[in-house]
Protein backbone atom coordinates (compact mmCIF):
# COMPACT_ATOMS: atom_id res chain seq x y z
CA UNK A 1 0.00 0.00 0.00
CA UNK A 2 1.73 3.10 -1.29
CA UNK A 3 0.12 5.54 1.15
CA UNK A 4 1.55 3.85 4.22
CA UNK A 5 4.57 5.44 5.89
CA UNK A 6 7.83 3.69 5.11
CA UNK A 7 9.75 1.94 7.86
CA UNK A 8 12.29 4.26 9.43
CA UNK A 9 10.30 7.37 8.51
CA UNK A 10 10.32 10.51 10.61
CA UNK A 11 7.36 9.60 12.82
CA UNK A 12 7.75 10.83 16.38
CA UNK A 13 4.42 10.42 18.18
CA UNK A 14 2.19 7.70 16.77
CA UNK A 15 3.02 4.00 16.87
CA UNK A 16 3.71 2.32 13.53
CA UNK A 17 0.22 0.76 13.49
CA UNK A 18 -1.48 4.03 14.45
CA UNK A 19 0.47 5.82 11.71
CA UNK A 20 -0.60 3.23 9.13
CA UNK A 21 -4.23 3.72 10.15
CA UNK A 22 -4.00 7.54 10.02
CA UNK A 23 -2.22 7.37 6.65
CA UNK A 24 -4.93 5.07 5.26
CA UNK A 25 -7.68 7.38 6.60
CA UNK A 26 -6.03 10.44 5.08
CA UNK A 27 -5.58 8.62 1.76
CA UNK A 28 -9.34 7.96 1.60
CA UNK A 29 -10.22 11.51 2.70
CA UNK A 30 -7.92 13.17 0.14
CA UNK A 31 -7.00 10.42 -2.33
CA UNK A 32 -4.27 10.72 -4.92
CA UNK A 33 -5.44 11.89 -8.31
CA UNK A 34 -4.09 11.22 -11.79
CA UNK A 35 -1.38 13.81 -11.18
CA UNK A 36 -0.24 12.06 -8.01
CA UNK A 37 -1.44 14.78 -5.67
CA UNK A 38 -3.16 13.58 -2.53
CA UNK A 39 -2.62 13.05 1.18
CA UNK A 40 0.00 10.32 0.67
CA UNK A 41 2.20 12.44 -1.59
CA UNK A 42 1.77 15.56 0.54
CA UNK A 43 2.97 13.73 3.68
CA UNK A 44 -0.21 14.41 5.67
CA UNK A 45 0.67 11.61 8.10
CA UNK A 46 3.83 13.47 9.11
CA UNK A 47 1.88 16.70 9.74
CA UNK A 48 -0.63 14.85 11.95
CA UNK A 49 2.09 12.91 13.78
CA UNK A 50 4.15 16.03 14.45
CA UNK A 51 1.09 18.04 15.53
CA UNK A 52 -0.04 15.35 17.98
CA UNK A 53 3.41 15.51 19.55
CA UNK A 54 3.28 19.30 19.84
CA UNK A 55 0.53 21.87 19.49
CA UNK A 56 -2.27 19.27 19.36
CA UNK A 57 -0.91 16.98 22.09
CA UNK A 58 -4.17 17.21 24.04
CA UNK A 59 -5.84 15.34 21.14
CA UNK A 60 -3.43 12.38 21.23
CA UNK A 61 -5.62 10.31 23.61
CA UNK A 62 -8.62 10.91 21.37
CA UNK A 63 -6.63 9.78 18.34
CA UNK A 64 -5.34 6.69 20.16
CA UNK A 65 -8.88 5.73 21.21
CA UNK A 66 -10.30 6.37 17.74
CA UNK A 67 -7.54 4.56 15.86
CA UNK A 68 -7.79 1.54 18.17
CA UNK A 69 -11.59 1.50 17.70
CA UNK A 70 -11.24 1.75 13.93
CA UNK A 71 -8.76 -1.13 13.77
CA UNK A 72 -10.89 -3.21 16.15
CA UNK A 73 -13.93 -2.60 13.94
CA UNK A 74 -11.98 -3.60 10.83
CA UNK A 75 -10.71 -6.76 12.49
CA UNK A 76 -14.14 -7.72 13.89
CA UNK A 77 -16.08 -7.08 10.67
CA UNK A 78 -13.52 -7.63 7.91
CA UNK A 79 -10.69 -9.68 9.53
CA UNK A 80 -8.10 -6.92 8.91
CA UNK A 81 -6.97 -3.66 10.41
CA UNK A 82 -8.35 -0.57 8.65
CA UNK A 83 -5.10 0.11 6.77
CA UNK A 84 -5.08 -3.40 5.30
CA UNK A 85 -8.64 -3.25 3.96
CA UNK A 86 -9.43 -2.79 0.29
CA UNK A 87 -10.07 0.93 -0.45
CA UNK A 88 -13.73 0.23 -1.33
CA UNK A 89 -14.26 -1.40 2.07
CA UNK A 90 -12.41 1.48 3.75
CA UNK A 91 -14.89 3.85 2.08
CA UNK A 92 -17.80 1.75 3.40
CA UNK A 93 -16.36 1.98 6.92
CA UNK A 94 -16.00 5.77 6.59
CA UNK A 95 -19.62 6.03 5.43
CA UNK A 96 -20.68 4.02 8.49
CA UNK A 97 -18.64 6.35 10.71
CA UNK A 98 -20.49 9.35 9.24
CA UNK A 99 -23.94 8.08 10.21
CA UNK A 100 -25.63 9.29 13.36
CA UNK A 101 -25.33 5.83 14.91
CA UNK A 102 -21.69 5.58 13.83
CA UNK A 103 -19.61 2.57 14.72
CA UNK A 104 -18.84 1.42 18.27
CA UNK A 105 -15.77 2.02 20.39
CA UNK A 106 -15.19 5.74 19.87
CA UNK A 107 -16.15 6.88 23.34
CA UNK A 108 -18.57 9.68 24.16
CA UNK A 109 -17.70 11.80 21.13
CA UNK A 110 -18.54 9.03 18.65
CA UNK A 111 -17.11 7.94 15.32
CA UNK A 112 -18.59 10.85 13.36
CA UNK A 113 -16.81 13.39 15.56
CA UNK A 114 -13.53 11.48 15.27
CA UNK A 115 -13.82 11.31 11.49
CA UNK A 116 -14.47 15.06 11.31
CA UNK A 117 -11.36 15.66 13.40
CA UNK A 118 -9.22 13.57 11.05
CA UNK A 119 -10.77 15.29 8.02
CA UNK A 120 -9.84 18.68 9.49
CA UNK A 121 -6.28 17.59 10.20
CA UNK A 122 -5.97 16.02 6.74
CA UNK A 123 -6.93 19.35 5.18
CA UNK A 124 -4.45 21.16 7.39
CA UNK A 125 -1.72 18.69 6.42
CA UNK A 126 -2.50 19.13 2.73
CA UNK A 127 -2.30 22.92 2.76
CA UNK A 128 -0.06 23.97 5.69
CA UNK A 129 3.39 25.41 5.27
CA UNK A 130 5.79 22.49 4.71
CA UNK A 131 7.60 23.48 7.91
CA UNK A 132 4.78 21.77 9.82
CA UNK A 133 5.45 18.39 8.20
CA UNK A 134 2.75 18.25 5.52
CA UNK A 135 2.30 19.81 2.08
CA UNK A 136 5.53 18.13 0.95
CA UNK A 137 7.07 19.88 -2.02
CA UNK A 138 4.26 22.47 -1.73
CA UNK A 139 1.98 20.00 -3.58
CA UNK A 140 -1.15 21.30 -1.85
CA UNK A 141 -0.30 24.90 -2.68
CA UNK A 142 0.44 23.97 -6.29
CA UNK A 143 -2.92 22.22 -6.48
CA UNK A 144 -4.64 25.45 -5.39
CA UNK A 145 -2.41 27.76 -7.40
CA UNK A 146 -1.25 29.45 -4.19
CA UNK A 147 2.01 31.34 -4.82
CA UNK A 148 3.38 30.63 -1.36
CA UNK A 149 4.69 32.85 1.39
CA UNK A 150 5.73 36.27 0.12
CA UNK A 151 7.17 39.26 1.92
CA UNK A 152 4.74 41.46 -0.01
CA UNK A 153 3.01 41.91 -3.32
CA UNK A 154 3.22 45.04 -5.43
CA UNK A 155 0.06 46.91 -6.37
CA UNK A 156 0.46 45.60 -9.92
CA UNK A 157 0.68 42.01 -8.69
CA UNK A 158 -2.57 42.42 -6.79
CA UNK A 159 -4.52 43.56 -9.85
CA UNK A 160 -5.86 41.46 -12.68
CA UNK A 161 -3.65 38.57 -13.70
CA UNK A 162 -2.98 35.66 -11.34
CA UNK A 163 0.39 35.74 -9.62
CA UNK A 164 2.59 33.07 -11.19
CA UNK A 165 6.04 32.36 -9.82
CA UNK A 166 8.37 29.50 -10.59
CA UNK A 167 9.45 29.19 -6.97
CA UNK A 168 6.76 28.75 -4.34
CA UNK A 169 8.07 30.35 -1.16
CA UNK A 170 7.79 28.69 2.25
CA UNK A 171 8.46 29.83 5.80
CA UNK A 172 12.00 28.48 5.44
CA UNK A 173 12.59 31.00 2.64
CA UNK A 174 11.64 33.76 5.09
CA UNK A 175 14.07 32.41 7.75
CA UNK A 176 11.33 30.84 9.85
CA UNK A 177 11.57 27.37 11.35
CA UNK A 178 9.10 24.97 12.94
CA UNK A 179 8.82 25.05 16.71
CA UNK A 180 7.28 22.01 18.47
CA UNK A 181 4.82 24.33 20.24
CA UNK A 182 3.13 24.67 16.86
CA UNK A 183 4.35 28.19 16.17
CA UNK A 184 6.79 29.47 13.60
CA UNK A 185 9.95 31.07 14.98
CA UNK A 186 12.23 33.41 13.06
CA UNK A 187 15.76 31.99 12.95
CA UNK A 188 18.41 34.00 14.77
CA UNK A 189 16.03 36.62 16.20
CA UNK A 190 14.32 34.89 19.13
CA UNK A 191 10.96 36.02 17.71
Model regions and ranges:
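Immediate post-signal-peptide N-terminus of mature secreted/exported proteins
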Residues: 2-39
